[in-house]
Amino acid sequence: MSQFKKHNLINNDITFALLLLIFSFLSHIALGILDNYRTNLVSIFALGLLLFTLRKHSKILFLIGFLFIFALSLGYLPSGLLYGPVSIGVIASVYETNFSETIGFFKAIPLSIYIFTFFYLLLFIVILLIQRHKTSNKSQKKIYATVYLALLAFSLYKPIAKEVKNTDPEKEFKLSEFFKASNFYPVSFLSNAIKVNNTYLTQRALLNDALTKTPEWQILSVEPKYQNYVLVIGESMRRDYTSLYGYPQKTTPFLEQVNGLIFNLYVAAGPNTQPSLQRTLYRSINNNEETVYTDNIISLAKLAHYKTYWLSNQGKVGEWDTMASRIGIQADESFFTKKGGYDSDNIADTALLEPLKQLLAKDKDQTKLIVLHLIGSHATFCAHLNGEEPKFHLISREMSCYLDTLKQTDSLLSEVNQILKDQGQSYSVIYFSDHGLAHLGAGKNLSMLNNKEYKQSYEVPFIRFSSDDTKRTLVKNPQSAFNFIHGFAQWLGIKESHLSQEDFFNPKPQTIKVFNWRALVDYQSLKEDPAKQEP
């Protein structure tokens, strides 16, 4: 009797249809609809209906469609649950993240995503096993044709309607843009992924082309105040976890006592490295919507006859295909601790100090710009402690390690300051982090990852300290990293025709926008994700 019930359950079309609907629902979530599934209910039903009809029609057609949806969804699943639909930020991370960073990403993923993945895999296997007992019925061709045509109409109605309404004869027709408007989410997801990927590759090609082109800078005058300028670009340091900005644990003792200028609120341009540094280190035009790929901090300093150096602990991925390394190779001299890419070792930022000493010791009559690009607090945090246990304690081991990495960066800045002092020449240092992070998980699984939704993903420390500073100055008005290129020129004493002559270090009140992987949005519209403290 039990075997008879089991056989009936396996062969029951209603059971199979329900399993396919659940599979469709989970696939939509994996592809990034997050909490927007209510608006995609028809799409969820449509995918379930398509798979059910395909199995009735042909086992081979079903397996092709089913396996394709599964592979697509499983491949995007972690990013889909964390970040939503495909964006330029997600695509950039795929291209510009090395192997160790990828491992760090998977280690930081919360347990809930692994549980979701387990049940999704389990459902996939169950459906594969059940469908083996199903028989195809090719005699119902009219019914199948009706279903396919209805689903095709559902998929194409909105794209066609949008194209009909298009009144711009100059607009180029693009297939990916056309299907992106589809109400059938798997189609719009795939189309958007292709479009965003092409956008990223176009940007990368423009950046590579810019290496051989003449910059558009038009320098009016150059009056350097210091002999040595050092720009330190940090990684993933949240402002509110530093004692510089009031965090109770002493994570940045050097920064909280050194004389200099501190922005009370400095807002990064983007929530992860590639989009943030593109909009920080390059000149932007058209209300920060476009980048001038030939015009960056290195090309500006070189035209102003500074001797330029780039010291990086971020490494190269492939043939100089990260945002930062493209700028770095334009310097007069560049040094990368990680010569390889995906299998590079985990090297401490202190490896940059000896090359720094060597550069400062030579050509002492030259005015120098030296950029240090740190690995800083990049995930996974504990990997940066060289096997030692964290000295700080905060809720989870990962968060404790994160605080330790902040202290490491603070100690490095203290050493940089001492090295510059020992040279006996005037100097000025700027430190900022490329972006912040947002919390993920809870309790002992608490960690942090990139997230575009929260203010703290953009709130980073910014401090300038120089050899002639005698006091600490707190700048109360907020400043945007979009304006950094203007402040960089001011810092180096460069006047240039494209750049604002307003005082970057004493900004007027302004509306600050950030790039959230899709568009520029008001920083104030973002959600809060306050720092954690020990109970």
Per-range role (PLM):
Residues 2-179:
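Transmembrane and membrane-interface helices of multi-pass
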Residues 4-21, 56-60, 299, 316-317, ...:
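Membrane-interface soluble catalytic domains
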Residues 33-34, 285-287, 397-406, 417-418, ...:
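Active-site rim elements
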Residues 47-48, 214-218, 354-361, 391-429:
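A long, amphipathic alpha-helix that forms part
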Residues 158-232, 236-390, 459, 481-512, ...:
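Active-site-proximal alpha/beta segments of enzymes that process anionic O-linked groups
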Residues 373, 378-379, 435, 446-449:
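Histidine-centered active-site/metal-ligand motif
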